[in-house]
Amino acid sequence: MSDPKLTKAVDSICDQFIVTKSKISQLTEYFIDCMEKGLEPCESDISQNKGLPMIPTFVTDKPSGQEHGVTMLAADLGGTNFRVCSVELLGNHEFKIEQEKSKIPTFFFQDDHHVTSKDLFQHMALITHQFLTKHHKDVIQDYKWKMGFTFSYPVDQTSLSSGKLIRWTKGFKIGDTVGQDVVQLFQQELNDIGLSNVHVVALTNDTTGTLLARCYASSDAARAINEPVIGCIFGTGTNGCYMEKLENIHKLDPASREELLSQGKTHMCINTEWGSFDNELNHLPTTSYDIKIDQQFSTNPGFHLFEKRVSGLYLGEILRNILLDLEKQELFDLKESVLKNNPFILTTETLSHIEIDTVENDLQDTRDALLKAADLETTFEERVLIQKLVRAISRRAAFLAAVPIAAILIKTNALNQSYHCQVEVGCDGSVVEHYPGFRSMMRHALALSPIGPEGERDVHLRISKDGSGVGAALCALHANY
């Protein structure tokens, strides 16, 4: 028999994570407003700008899928791994990829002033050299390589091949990188180890790469579905991009905009940096656990507050803080569990096992997952309540994840471009790809959003694999040395 007080407390907490239809509509409307504000000219201090960052990527074309006969490099600095790959475009929506992935050493995430930008980018350059030695030894020095660099952190991008870091996210704490051009930092280290023939010609992020990769792979022969209109990431972090009309990007230098228009360009990919949506907390659903995690356990308090409710890095931490609170109320006993003193120990993999476990199984998968992750023994009654919490956390995340999708579709009028118009959304990231039911919950929220059930039926959420690799290579394709 479960403790009535514990059950009541858990039910009360779950109620705090409910996102209603009216809240989805309110958030969608506000998101559009923040997009429009973000497209206006920037303040001199970029951190003081209102609205979303809405960073121009200087990518003005989407691939057709027929590009072929060239091999390029891509480097991807994510939140967990650094990856180098070579991409050979074969045409007909096909490509060949060679890649190596290495885990980023933990000391780069520690608050250690002795770790510098040079340490990080030298590490990346050495891994690039190892990759070329292994996979392209015969031409390592004889070939002029174009490289696209996927750097999925907020940057002030001023051209296709230059951008200064605004702030770190995802746990990095290397202070001297902020304000520096990350392309120059990487290129310098490549030059210093003898790879001056590798030219970092395009700076992109994982969302732009996801959109471009999905465009290359998309091959709807009947043209019943429009080419992808949004690229999005729901993994360790979250972000999204889309193609905006040049005439609406008022923050672009007027001369640059006119030059692009004179070249026949009509759109530019905008990196929304939607992880920063509503940092002012005007409308975002907020619990005491969200506030505590932001202020006490995150590396960037006050920033990326949308991301801290949606991304995989934080979902398990929300659960951990709820359990700590229940123990503080003397309603739950964490015993000697390592949960007490280890922030971020609960991963989305652990939550995934809990999410889909069944009562018929006595929630044994939940028991095993909590034992493995946190050395926490639980009763069946406790597991029932923990599963209820997990499902409340994930449902809120998925419902919030639908908001920017709906907002962009409305702002761009993407669902009304042609008769019976349907659109693709290219998605990447461990949460959207692997978390049980996440996409289904997103679709439910889209139907509740202002696009309605009719609009939701015309939206296709497609997993776009290798966006940060293939997409970065595609970004580099037409760039100059």
UniProtKB/Swiss-Prot annotation:
CDD domains: ASKHA_NBD_GLK1-2_fungi. One of its GO terms (biological process) is intracellular glucose homeostasis. ATP binds at residues 101, 466-471. Residues 4-477 form the Hexokinase domain. PANTHER family: GLUCOKINASE-1-RELATED (PTHR19443:SF30), HEXOKINASE (PTHR19443). It catalyses: D-glucose + ATP = D-glucose 6-phosphate + ADP + H(+); a D-hexose + ATP = a D-hexose 6-phosphate + ADP + H(+); D-mannose + ATP = D-mannose 6-phosphate + ADP + H(+). GO terms for molecular function: ATP binding; D-glucose binding; fructokinase activity; glucokinase activity; mannokinase activity. Glukokinase specific for aldohexoses. Phosphorylates glucose and mannose, but not fructose. This is Glucokinase-1. GO terms for cellular component: cytosol; mitochondrion. The keyword RNA-binding does not apply.
